[in-house]
């Protein structure tokens, strides 16, 4: 689960960066 969460966090951060731009 932790590994999956890490992947999810990476994807979430990418989305946040896009929205932040």
Curated annotation (Swiss-Prot):
Per its record, what are the GO molecular function terms?
A: serine-type endopeptidase activity; toxin activity
- Quote the subcellular location field of this record: Secreted
Keyword set, alphabetical order: Disulfide bond, Fibrinogenolytic toxin, Hemostasis impairing toxin, Hydrolase, Protease, Secreted, Serine protease, Toxin
Q: Which GO terms describe its biological process?
A: proteolysis
Protein EC: 3.4.21.-
| Keyword Protease part of the UniProt annotation | yes
Tissue expression, as annotated, is: Expressed by the venom gland.
Q: Which GO terms describe its cellular component?
A: extracellular space
According to the record, the protein's activity is controlled as follows: Inhibited by PMSF, bovine aprotinin (APR), and soybean trypsin inhibitor (STI). Is not inhibited by EDTA, beta-mercaptoethanol, and high temperature (85 degrees Celsius).
Q: Which domain of life is it from?
A: Eukaryota
Enzyme category, top tier? hydrolase
- What quaternary arrangement does the UniProt entry report? Monomer.
What is the purpose of this protein? Answer: Snake venom serine protease that completely cleaves fibrinogen Aalpha chain (FGA), partially cleaves Bbeta chain (FGB) and has no activity on gamma chain. Is more potent that A2 and A3 alpha-fibrinogenases. Very active within 5 minutes.
Entry similarity comment: Belongs to the peptidase S1 family. Snake venom subfamily.
Which protein, by its recorded name, is this? Alpha-fibrinogenase A1
